Amino acid sequence: MVYSDTKTSKKIKKYKINIMKKKLNIFQIPLKGIHLIEASAGTGKTSTIAFLYLRLLLGLEKNKENIRKLSVKEILVVTFTNAAKEELYIRIKKSIKELHLSCIKKKSKDPIFQSFLTKIKNFDEAIHILEDAKININNAAIYTIHGFCQDVLENNTLISNREIIENESFLYLQATQDFWRYFFYNLPKKIIKIIYEEYRSPEDLLREIKPILKVNSSINFKKKFDKKETLITFHEKIINKINIFKQKWLNYNLIILKIINQLKVNKKIYSNFNILKWKKKITEWAESETKNYKMPICLKYFSETSIEKNIKNYNFKKHIFFEEIDKILKKNFSLKNIILFYAIKNIPKFVKREKEKKLLLGFNDLLKILLKNIKKEESLREIIIKQYPVALIDEFQDTNIQQYQIFNTLYKNKKTALFLVGDPKQSIYSFRGADIFSYLHAKFKIKNYYYLDTNWRSSKNICKAINYLFSKNKNPFYFKNIPFEPILSSSKNLNMKFKIKEKNQTAISFFFQKKEEVNIEEYRDWIAKQCANEISYWLTCSKKGEAIISDGSQERILTEKDIVILVRNRTEAQIIKESLKKVNILSKYSSPYESVFKTFDALELLSILKSILDPTDINLLKKSILTHILNKIAFQKIKENSKTKISHFLIQKLYEYNDKWKTIGIFYTIKTMILEYQKYANNFEMYKNQQRNINFLHIAELLQEKSQNCYKENSLMRWFEKKILEKNNISENEYIKNFAESKIIRIITIHKSKGLEYPIVWIPFIVDFNVSKSYFYHEKKTLKIFFDNNKSSETLKKSDEERLAEDLRFLYVALTRSIYHCSIGISYLVKKRKKNKKSSDIHKSSLGYIIQNGKCMNYKELLYELKILNKKLYIEVKYQAMNCKSLTIKKDDLYILSQPQFLLKEIKLYSQITSFTKIKQENKHFNNIQYNNIESYFFKEKDKKKTIHNFPHGNKAGIFIHYILKTIKFNNTFNIDWFYTILKKYEFSEKWAKTLMFWINNILNFKINNLNITLSSLKKTQYIKELEFFLPIKNTLYCEDLNQIIQSIDLISSISQKIFFNPVIGILKGFIDLVFIFNKKYYILDYKCNYLGNNDNCYSSKNIKKEIIKNRYDIQYQLYTLALHQYLKKKVKQYHYKTHFGGVFYLFLRGINVKDSIFYILPDYLLIKKLTKLILQKK
């Protein structure tokens, strides 16, 4: 879509008068007013922001000595992603540190810092300011856009008791389902059948409109419907039009058949037989009842268009009905228009209603609320400006209209400063809501316009090649308003070279598939092979010392870590991975900002470490044995000694690791495991798993570091679990230390590569494209967003123009990642083969548009353009990669460890156990379970009288009893054979069967306090077993806050010692053994299999109370109550705690023969309210 209309051109010319485009001098730009800084790729955008930040800290204004110096809390820095926020924080922190050191030394090797020194008049003051900034950098106002909005709104109490949600997908699905029910359920069946042909489910409808619903600006419709227009009335209108046409057919068909018979038509198509057959079909349709909008396919042969194509004499006698047929065939009758109109109008309303009902806010709601309030409240604007007199907005090209309006409204005052830094050529995030048109709109309103013109990243020839490619076309980014300015190369990069066998390689190599009419599958296979072969050739040369990278001052040999392949998605990545695999090159598809805690290795290590902390927990043992490390060690033990019992061996091994952990620390414990694994692994396994070992050791380092501040091992595991669950907040030291640094080729999406740089880049699939199927576009004159629910071909064309424009920006981002060299694939690509097709489709792709100047070209014309490119010293066109043998990997053993080598047949396990709270676990000493107890689990028991008191105690026994109570039906009678089976399954002696049967029977018939009920009397509809819950900890939970609340209200807590744990935030997960309803009240019942002594008298109220205090079961019942309270609020109409919640029972199962073996408490409502506020309500 090119802005060529008169009104827009005049508007742009008007703005151009006001815009003074200047090259940026970091020390000359005023620190007041609104400034736009356009920074092309590699020109130092992040450094520019950091240097402006330093100027603001020191108050270095041109010719002004009295400008106020700002603190780190007063300089607002806003970007759009957490990764960018982290990068800015690191760069600003580093710059403060470097300038501080330079001020102390009064000299610097860096020319920028040296320039700062010449402008500082009072070094003592500057050192003090920078030292203060270093100390307070953690309080710097560096935000994502949504983080900034949330902070302002919460600090000014404009939102309260609202949960902020990042992902609103579930709300939109629910709203679409509500819309579906509201609009469709009461329709006649005949209309529902027609709708079903368009959309089979609410999910289908949501899939089509989701891109439109993501747009923050208001949407305009090409066709609007009157409020009185319903699906029924619209349907009836369509049916009426079809019926009118049917009647016309019955009236005129003989006349038009007579006309056709008189014409010299193509008799191969219009034979008498065909004409009569078509007439019969159409007449039968015309005489039948109209139930849908389908037309007979053969009707097209009677259209004016079809007849004109198939006659020799075009001046045939026309009848008006021929034209009528053409018109009705073009109508494409459908209910989609009206459905989409009402869906787009109403679904956001349903979402809004649901958010208000559930007290939820999405990220975009934060923008809307803040914009609304700052527009109407001058006092709020003043508060924000007073707090942040200067704002630096990073990645401004990724803005949308609301984000721009917020900052424009705040910083219109001349006394403030707003710096907008970005590059419209790199706006590639429309799928996330970024709107390049908002940027263009803002650009035209800003008078102070600066640019950066020196590329500090790439070699001179890379800069030349990119300048040439994007200067070939007058509008290289399709829109006239996004021009391309040739970039200069930094003087330090003038001698950068990539050499193979002492020959300098060109900056860009195009690999062209010399074949006409190539389809996408053929092209993908071919270019993937070329990519793999070329990289194989480079690496082979590298092994011989013949592949060299030189920065002008020193040379080094090319390694795998220097090479990156850029793709669009996982599908393209997989194609490349397979090709690389064929030539024995290892590769990895990953995110550049991926945390080591998000790897599968972190989950495996967590399973192992948990098992080390509790070797007797069979459930943990099951998970840990399925990990690669323990599985290999155990499997090798079987090979060495087939008589070894795996369960015994593993438990002993886990206890060994446990001792090491306590004596030499977690890092060396993990390292010992890896060394033991490597002792049994063959060379190829070790080669294959080097990345995993790097990850394990990396996590071990982080855990060792964290362990210095952790009170207990379980506390460390809680932190470890939290890091695995965290979505954001990734620290730089957590980024994966890729084995790719030495041995693996990285494959990264172009989206994720933005902002990064790589020595050598391959872009194999950039010539591919997907024509837009969206009916969503920006109107040329007003830049308003339109949705064409009429679905015209003109709209599709406009939408595809916008797609191509973004693809061109996508290409620019990909090309500008390279430092020394970039290889690109290209082909004479034909998406859909057509007869007599004289041109390919690549002009519709970004690369084709650039090379062919936006023109349609045939094969010879494309070859000619490539020959012109090939004449440039910095560009080369290749037709095939260098032939090279596959790289060899030494394999002492071809066996590949692809999965655990044996499944536990020996250890029979169940699937679930009751979870204790993690907070309690942090205070539990490991030595509560003694090694001697293991014998009662795995070895033959001595013959003695069987009672419930001497039934094996410990973790395994508790799990076993819980499993029985979870599995059985409360009101059934038992067969002793079942007990024999289950005892055998869990490796207990079958001699316990009779005792166990009586014990379980007594439990089920035990009277629960004053309720006068038993478990066996409960109906199935009265209870839920193993109710799982997840409670989000919205605020960092500190032990001091929890102790203060529970000890001030709860009697048991008040006489218990304070609990200690590290600050936590994340998700609290648990299982409630039993929830039951009686007399309209809901109760929690938790089974306790604790051993208090060898007779019934040991289970007195006094002893039970001591056991509850000792194990801090008070915190358990408080959190369980909180969880059930939240659950019932959603499930019970007009729910209130005091009316509907009955309390908590702890049933001590070994004391079931005495009345006192049950403990009851009803937690105070005030306690639950305070816990809700502390844990669940975002502060």
From Swiss-Prot:
Q: Which CDD domains match?
A: RecB_C-like
Details of cofactor binding: Binds 1 Mg(2+) ion per subunit.
> Among its keywords, does the record have Ligase?
no
* Residue positions binding ATP: A39, S40, A41, G42, T43, G44, K45, T46
Q: Which GO terms describe its cellular component?
A: cytosol; exodeoxyribonuclease V complex
**What region holds the UvrD-like helicase C-terminal domain?**
485-755
- Give GO terms for biological process: double-strand break repair via homologous recombination
Q: Which InterPro entries match?
A: DNA_helicase_UvrD-like_C, DNA_helicase_UvrD/REP, P-loop_NTPase, PDDEXK-like_dom_sf, RecB, Restrct_endonuc-II-like, UvrD-like_ATP-bd
Q: Which GO terms describe its molecular function?
A: 3'-5' DNA helicase activity; ATP binding; ATP hydrolysis activity; DNA binding; exodeoxyribonuclease V activity; magnesium ion binding
Q: Which cofactor does it need?
A: Mg(2+)
Q: What is known of its domains?
A: The N-terminal DNA-binding domain is a ssDNA-dependent ATPase and has ATP-dependent 3'-5' helicase function. This domain interacts with RecC. The C-terminal domain has nuclease activity and interacts with RecD. It interacts with RecA, facilitating its loading onto ssDNA.
Supply any other comment: In the RecBCD complex, RecB has a slow 3'-5' helicase, an exonuclease activity and loads RecA onto ssDNA, RecD has a fast 5'-3' helicase activity, while RecC stimulates the ATPase and processivity of the RecB helicase and contributes to recognition of the Chi site.
Family of the protein in this entry: Belongs to the helicase family. UvrD subfamily.
The identity of this protein, by name, is: RecBCD enzyme subunit RecB
Organism of origin = Buchnera aphidicola subsp. Schizaphis graminum (strain Sg)
Q: What is the lineage of its organism?
A: Bacteria, Pseudomonadati, Pseudomonadota, Gammaproteobacteria, Enterobacterales
